[in-house]
Every structure is written in C-alpha cells, then in structure tokens.
C-alpha cells in the first residue's frame, strides 16, 4: 500500500441530477442539529465498504477552536455512533477514512479565512476509536536529532517559514524528516538535507512501536547537482519494502527496482529497469491526467505487484501504456506495452499520441486489475480548454487486455457532450465477486427524442465473465434539487438528494440489477 493511498481515496466525485423514485431513506439533517458540512463513504483496508460518516458544524467555540459533530452510519444507513468534538478553528470541515489500525480518521479541509494570514496554521486530523466512540487529535511525530518529537500544537505557517529561512542561511540546507506509522508495526522515517535544487544525506529508518531503531539504510550521502540518488517507495508488506531507485550521473539517468528487507534494512534484490524513456520510468508508480486527476494505477496480489503507467516518448506526450509486473518471489520485473495505434481497428481516427477527431484525445479515468491477470483501461474523449472555448468530454472508451496485456477488444459508451465539468460524468467503480468482475458508474444528460426535454441518466455498467451489461436509470427534472451518488454495499448504489434552500438532505439505497 502506498503511504498516501488512503488520502488519495478521501473525496468522491459528485454531479448534479434529480431523481423521482422513492426508496428507503435517512434524513441527514435529522441526525444532528448543527450545519451539515460533509458526507462520505468509508472503506476498510481491503477496499470493502464499511459505512458512512456525516459531519456537522456549530461554529466558533474558542480563540483557536470550532465545535463539530460526527455521525457514523453502517452500510445499511443505520446510525451507530455520534459525538460532538472541538476541532481547530482553521478546519472548515472533515472527511473520513478508516486506517490500518481500524480507527476512523477525520481529515480536515483548511479554512484560510478563519484567521489572519500571519496566524494561519494547518488543522490537525482527529482520530476516533470505533470500539469506544472516543475522539482525540491524531498523534503525529517529527524526527530530529535522533529522537521523536510529538507534535502537540500545529505550527504557525509564517513562523515555520521564518525558521526554514533562518536554517537555510545558517546551514545552506533544510533538514527534512517524514514519519509514517506502518501496518507492519512501528514507524518508517525518511530524513534528508534539502538544498533546493538537490538533496543528499538520505536515510531510511525503521523503528519499533517503542520508537527504538531497528535499522538504518543510508543512500545518496554525497549527492549534488550532477550526481544523486532518489528512491520512491511504492509498496511494502511484512517482508519487504519495494522501491524505484533513480540514479543521476550528469545528465544521464538509470532506474532500478530495489527491494529492501523490512526486518533488517538490507538490500534483498536490485533489478535494472531498461528499454523505456526516462519519463516513463520516472512516472511508472503514479498517473496524472490532463484534467487534473490522479489515478490509483496499481494492485498487489499474493504473488505479484501489477501497475500500469503511461509510455512517454517525450516529456509531454505518450504513445500508449506500459504494464510492469514485479514477481514477489523472484523479484524479477517484466514489461508489456500497449500503443494507441493498436486501437485503430476500433477507433480508426486515433493518432500515435491518442488524439481523435476534432481535437479530442483519450483521457484516463480508471484502471481495473482483475483476478485473471487482465487489465481494463477506461478512458474518456476529452478536449482541453482553448482561448475561447470550454473544456469538453464525450464518449467513454473501455479497453480490454488479456493476461499478457495484449489488446482483446474495445467498447465505446456513447455519451452527450459535457462542457466545463469534465471530471463529473464518470463517477466510481467497485470490484465484484472477489475481484473477478467489476462495475462502474457514469452519468449523462440526454434529450428525449419525443418530448425534446433533457434529463439526467445514471448508467450502471457491469463486466462479468468478460461480458458487459448496462442498466440505465432515467432521471426526472426537479428544480434546484441535487443528487450525489456514492458507493453502496454490493448490489446497491447510495443516492443523496438535497436542496439547501428547502433544508432537504436525504440519502437512500437503490437496488441494482446485477
């Protein structure tokens, strides 16, 4: 699991639609008396739905605090716990996630207007013990001078910047440390000296639960502008830490898979990564899209780690995708590529760089890593914003590959043109049947052929045993009412309908036909 994986899962997409079918409901405004601030789904470490959390605000309660309340619902929408708490005044709202300790973490969204700019500090996360329904500020640590320092008060941003500038003047660099609590027990700490244009004196350390050092792994000790090493962790388990090591020698780069023993800190395996551009290997562990979305691009199985990235032929253009598999027994690495031009039998006008007709290009929306070894790639036809034109999206395109990453088919889901809200139509996905199959959801605003009226439609697309089935829920207009879809328990979707003016904010589970 990546260290930032859970946070990368915090905020779900939403869209504006209206709905006319009645179902089992829960009134969010009746669950607490405060102002409703946020609602989101909660997932466990296996990405299974745990339930939902709804957050409410009561305004300023002190010079540096605000009063909030949380309500936890199970996946059947039954309220199971609630409590009022004091949060930092610079928190505007909280979203929730379940960490590997099975604690519910409330992660804040900063409010930069709550205090004067020179007094602003980043709000702290809150930690809820689900077994006792108790809440406290989440404990964070800094590491400096060979010891852990508990962060009890958030540091003023302006003062922190002054300290950094003073340290840079004195030493010529800033000392940086990052502390992560890990599921395998204890802590992982990164430390290094940051000179601005380069770093050196890198150290990766592991500590036990009592903060005793178990091992230290030093690298890039003498790094400078011309020669340096950089290591990115992309996975870890009870046995190993998996990293991509990049070495720079003047203007030349080389890349390696470097596996470090979790228990001893020694290098277990090093495998050169070759045959691809520097840009491809640099970005193999993460994927960003032109419409400003990051995607989860890997999945860990019992015997392997699979990831798919863009295959770059220059700094700014890619000609398709590259799949990398790490064998967890031998640590051997294998690559396979899929090029945009391989899609020509299905998309005749596609270019080598993924462009289509009228300036549209294929923009990534999701990856699906199935148990049989195949990978599905979901994309949307996207046109970037011009000087005098809005960004636009149209059809969704699903690319099938087999276990060897060979193209096995393409399916196009025709969709009306959307302007501006280019991240709003594709919603989310869920694995089905223990990862063998998948379902994904998108919306579309369509005109009725007879009445000529435009209505929102929700499309539920299941891929089971390699075959697609689509269910469509037609939406009726209801002025000024919004509906936000969320992940529901398997076989259901949760719809939240609200209108702030009418003080209407309800959720309901809708049964799906799969």
Regions found by a protein language model. Give the residues of each.
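Bacterial Sec-dependent N-terminal signal peptides
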Residues: 1-28
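Conserved blade-ending motifs and adjacent loop-strand segments that build the rim/top face
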Residues: 85, 272-290, 338-358, 408-429, ...
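Post-signal peptide N-terminal segment of secreted/secretory-pathway proteins
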Residues: 42-153, 176-184, 191, 201
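Short beta-strand elements that form the blades of beta-propeller/WD-repeat-like
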Residues: 47-63, 96, 102-116, 184-197, ...
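Beta-propeller blade signature
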Residues: 67-75, 120-132, 201-212, 254-266, ...
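Loop/turn-rich, solvent-exposed surfaces of beta-rich toroidal or solenoidal domains
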Residues: 309-310, 321, 363-385, 389-394, ...
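Start-of-domain marker
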Residues: 24-92, 253, 299-302, 312-317, ...
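Structural signature of eukaryotic scaffold interfaces centered on beta-propeller domains
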Residues: 37-48, 95-102, 110-111, 153-185, ...
């Amino acid at each position: 699991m990546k260290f930032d994986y859970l946070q990368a899962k915090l905020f779900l997409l939403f869209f504006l639609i209206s709905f006319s079918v009645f179902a089992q409901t829960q009134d969010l405004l009746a669950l607490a008396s405060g102002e409703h601030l946020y609602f989101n789904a909660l997932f466990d470490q296996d990405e299974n739905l745990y339930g939902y959390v709804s957050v409410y605000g009561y305004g300023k309660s002190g010079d540096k605090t605000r009063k909030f309340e949380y309500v936890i619902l199970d996946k059947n929408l039954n309220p199971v716990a609630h409590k009022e708490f004091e949060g930092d005044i610079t928190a505007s709202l909280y979203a929730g996630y379940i960490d590997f300790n099975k604690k519910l973490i409330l992660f804040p969204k900063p409010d930069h207007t709550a205090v004067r700019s020179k007094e602003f500090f980043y709000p702290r996360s809150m930690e809820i013990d689900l077994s006792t329904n108790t809440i406290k500020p989440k404990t964070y640590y800094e590491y400096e001078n060979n010891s852990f320092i508990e962060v009890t008060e958030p540091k003023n941003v302006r003062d922190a910047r002054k300290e950094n500038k003073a340290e840079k003047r004195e030493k010529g660099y800033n000392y940086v440390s990052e502390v992560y609590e890990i599921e395998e027990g204890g802590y992982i700490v990164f430390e290094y000296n940051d000179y601005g244009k380069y770093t050196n004196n890198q150290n990766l350390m592991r500590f036990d639960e009592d903060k005793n050092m178990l091992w230290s792994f030093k690298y890039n000790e003498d790094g400078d502008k011309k020669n340096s090493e950089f290591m990115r962790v992309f996975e870890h388990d009870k046995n190993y830490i998996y990293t991509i090591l990049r070495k720079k020698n003047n203007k030349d780069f080389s890349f390696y898979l470097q596996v470090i023993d979790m228990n001893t800190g020694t290098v277990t395996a090093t495998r050169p990564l070759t045959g691809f551009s520097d840009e491809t290997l640099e970005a193999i562990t993460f994927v960003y899209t032109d419409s400003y979305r990051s995607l989860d691009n890997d999945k860990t199985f019992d015997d392997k780690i699979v990831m798919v990235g863009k295959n770059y032929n220059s700094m700014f253009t890619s000609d398709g995708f590259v799949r990398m598999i790490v064998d967890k027994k031998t640590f051997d690495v294998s690559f396979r590529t899929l090029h945009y031009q391989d899609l020509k039998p299905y998309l005749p006008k596609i270019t080598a760089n993924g462009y289509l007709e009228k300036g549209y290009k294929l923009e990534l929306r999701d990856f699906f890593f199935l148990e049989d070894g195949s990978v599905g790639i979901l994309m949307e036809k996207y046109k970037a914003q011009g000087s005098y034109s809005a960004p636009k999206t149209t059809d969704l395109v699903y690319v099938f590959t087999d276990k060897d990453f060979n193209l096995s088919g393409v399916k196009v889901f025709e969709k009306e043109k959307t302007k501006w809200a280019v991240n709003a139509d594709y919603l989310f996905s869920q694995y089905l049947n223990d990862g063998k199959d998948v379902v994904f959801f998108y919306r579309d605003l369509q005109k009725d052929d007879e009445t000529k009226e435009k209505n929102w439609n929700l499309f539920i697309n299941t891929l089971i045993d390699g075959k697609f089935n689509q269910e469509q829920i037609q939406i009726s207009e209801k002025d000024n009412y919004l509906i936000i879809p969320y992940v529901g328990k398997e076989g259901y979707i949760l719809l939240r309908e609200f209108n702030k003016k009418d003080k209407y904010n309800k959720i309901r589970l809708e049964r799906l036909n799969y």
